[in-house]
Amino acid sequence: MSSEVKQLIVVAEGTAALGPYWQTIVSDYLEKIIRSFCGSELNGERNPVSTVELSLVIFNSHGSYCACLVQRSGWTRDVDIFLHWLSSIQFGGGGFNEVATAEGLAEALMMFSPPSGQAQPSNDLKRHCILITASNPHILPTPVYRPRLQNVERNENGDAQAESRLSDAETVASYFAKCSVSLSVVCPKQLPTIRALYNAGKPNQQSADLSIDTAKNTFYLVLISENFVEACAALSHSATNLPQTQSPVKVDRATVAPSIPVTGQPPAPVSSANGPIQNRQPVSVGPVPTATVKVEPSTVTSMAPVPSFPHIPAVARPATQAIPSIQTSSASPVSQDMVSNAENAPDIKPVVVSGMTPPLRTGPPGGANVNLLNNLSQVRQVMSSAALAGAASSVGQSAVAMHMSNMISTGMATSLPPSQTVFSTGQQGITSMAGSGALMGSAQTGQSPGPNNAFSPQTTSNVASNLGVSQPMQGMNQGSHSGAMMQGGISMNQNMMSGLGQGNVSSGTGGMMPTPGVGQQAQSGIQQLGGSNSSAPNMQLSQPSSGAMQTSQSKYVKVWEGNLSGQRQGQPVLITRLEGYRSASASDSLAANWPPTMQIVRLISQDHMNNKQYVGKADFLVFRAMSQHGFLGQLQDKKLCAVIQLPSQTLLLSVSDKACRLIGMLFPGDMVVFKPQIPNQQQQQQQQLHQQQQQQQQIQQQQQQQQHLQQQQMPQLQQQQQQHQQQQQQQHQLSQLQHHQQQQQQQQQQQQQHQLTQLQHHHQQQQQASPLNQMQQQTSPLNQMQQQTSPLNQMQQQQQPQQMVMGGQAFAQAPGRSQQGGGGGQPNMPGAGFMG
């Protein structure tokens, strides 16, 4: 038998828009398809004669954002090498425009070997192509090469036209059916343009699409060609084989840890409520990034019976808080583990299925992170109770897939009010209550004819996935319980987050927007979680801050929903759709006049939002991007913020560390005024000047106080000055009196001397002319004069000590002297009477 050559080309988008979803796509879809395609394990048989060739094509976007438009690899037959190529793709670039999907598909068509002349059966094609993209294709036709066909159009000379032609992506996709190549698509978003590409590449437009397992990734668009038998078998083998009338539980998942060699000891097997569990190999799983998921209830009735799920492994948790082992079957690789993606956390679609009795088993969920952005100061609060996302309840003859309605949502309201969300099957009900009290250790036990295993509380509150629970979650740590009380026999299904001990849960990269009006969130009285990223289903919650549940209204209110657009070459380009939330304390008319589309006018550095001081009041808002875009990643990488001019406000928009989360600062008016930033030296100088001014003010105050004191002391000073002036006047009068007395004394002495000289001269004449008697008579006046001079000498002697005393005691003796001076006459001499 001749060897058959089978070819598979993976055409992947290389921009940053696909980067967050790539690991999920590789682990959940591509790896399964490739291994099934290379092994050909159809119906348990292996076909050794087939030869497999694998290749990779990477396309980017038009413009200057990407260095290369299309890249291709060679052909390889080694599966591991090809998987290594897939895991080594570096995503980056992109922009506002669409991607070059047409060029990538055309390159893949040209790489395939030309079709042989013999027509191949449509259900047994050997050449396949898988398109992986997260962006819309370029809408304008571009020059691409297309392969030659037997019935191609010919020119005037009759030669086949194989030159470059203008074609869009849908036109190129239509050539796949003509070239006997199956076209399948995997898109992490529900894009209508990608579905149109798949429909254009279908050989039979009337054929119905096959049901593909999208339970893990709710919003993923996975369309596998019916002619790609190996891919359909690989994905249907891991699916639940549910009827088309039943919607599987939809959980958006992302990055999955690669398989790791078997290590550690397997935990003790746990008996199931519906039968024993087969022996499975314990597998240790590496750290996985996690995130929270929104729960939205829905009800489906009248479901047909379904077979059991032997491929979904059970989860057992050891009593210790170390990283546990996960039991999984050998037929299901570890990459099938369900983990949450922090960057894309859409709705969980729970269903209520009646009329089914087969045993249900759960797959090993990843660690759950409940990271809630409650306010703009980045205060993170999380639920302080168990968050169950996917438990199944066996009630009589029905199996109920139950989801806790108290999970933190992504910003969309639930279908029922929080206090009225009820899951019912007609016989038993599982009621989600917005309770206001602490979870009690016991509750009403539902009447269930099925097997009920007592749920015994443990110190670590271990919950096995396959335990039949007849009591509502005993053994929880004391604290706020934001979950629902479950009644009836419950068999835990997918994504059970157990382990309510004293531990921590890793705070991953994604936080969920609080849903307005949902009371079960219990945003008050709960603490932040922190811990280790683990793919184990253990969820250890920190001790709550209060012993009773506290219900509170949401701190954010949705005020706006619209489009965010930019400009490219003067034309507006849609970036993403936004939802705006304001604080509950902000004004109701904050976004009253906002337009449906916000236009970015320019980009500025993010430092303006973090380090600047603004004049006036700024309101903070939180925005949620409905879809991820490469432009938002560039804003975060380059630390830029967008300036949006609103009718009467200015909005500065920056991307936060959380996926699809944007922070806005809203300013009134059409411009933002910054306070000038002053360098340190100038600040020091200003401080010095301020100190100097303070010192001057203190000095002025002191001077004012002194002046005030002086004003108070002025009367005393004036009195002292008057007294001093009086003293000076008295001293002056005394000096004048002394001078006058001296003059009088001198005059008297001169007169006396003159009289003496006259008397002496007259006496001499008398001696010469008269006898001795006359001379004696004449001497008597002389004696009399001498006697008169003696009192005068006495007065001079008395005045000298008085002048000395007056130098120090002039004030005391001044009145007496003034009376003496006021007499004006000669002093009374005690010797005057003696002369008479």
Swiss-Prot record:
It comes from Arabidopsis thaliana. Residues 260-285, 435-466, 518-547, 731-836 are annotated as: Disordered. Keywords: Coiled coil, Flowering, Jasmonic acid signaling pathway, Nucleus, Transcription, Transcription regulation. Belongs to the Mediator complex subunit 25 family. One of its GO terms (molecular function) is transcription coactivator activity. The keyword GTP-binding does not apply. The gene is MED25. Residues 680-761 form a coiled coil. Component of the Mediator complex, a coactivator involved in the regulated transcription of nearly all RNA polymerase II-dependent genes. Mediator functions as a bridge to convey information from gene-specific regulatory proteins to the basal RNA polymerase II transcription machinery. Mediator is recruited to promoters by direct interactions with regulatory proteins and serves as a scaffold for the assembly of a functional preinitiation complex with RNA polymerase II and the general transcription factors. Positive regulator of shade avoidance and of jasmonate signaling. Pfam families: Med25_VWA. GO terms for biological process: defense response to fungus; flower development; jasmonic acid mediated signaling pathway; positive regulation of defense response; positive regulation of DNA-templated transcription; positive regulation of flower development; red, far-red light phototransduction; regulation of flower development. Residues 731-818, 827-836 have a biased composition (Low complexity). The affinity between DREB2A and MED25 is reduced when DREB2A is pre-bound to DNA. Residues 271-282, 442-466 have a biased composition (Polar residues). Induction: Down-regulated by methyl jasmonate and by infection with an incompatible isolate of a necrotrophic fungal pathogen. Disruption phenotype: Late-flowering phenotype when grown under long-day conditions. Increased drought tolerance and sensitivity to necrotrophic pathogens. Increased resistance to hemibiotrophic fungal pathogen F.oxysporum. One of its GO terms (cellular component) is mediator complex. This is Mediator of RNA polymerase II transcription subunit 25. It is found in: Nucleus. Component of the Mediator complex. Interacts with the transcription factors BBX20, RAP2-2, ERF1B, ERF091, ERF095, ERF098, ERF109, HB29, PHL1, DREB2A, ABI5 and MYC2. Interacts with the E3 ubiquitin-protein ligases MBR1 and MBR2.
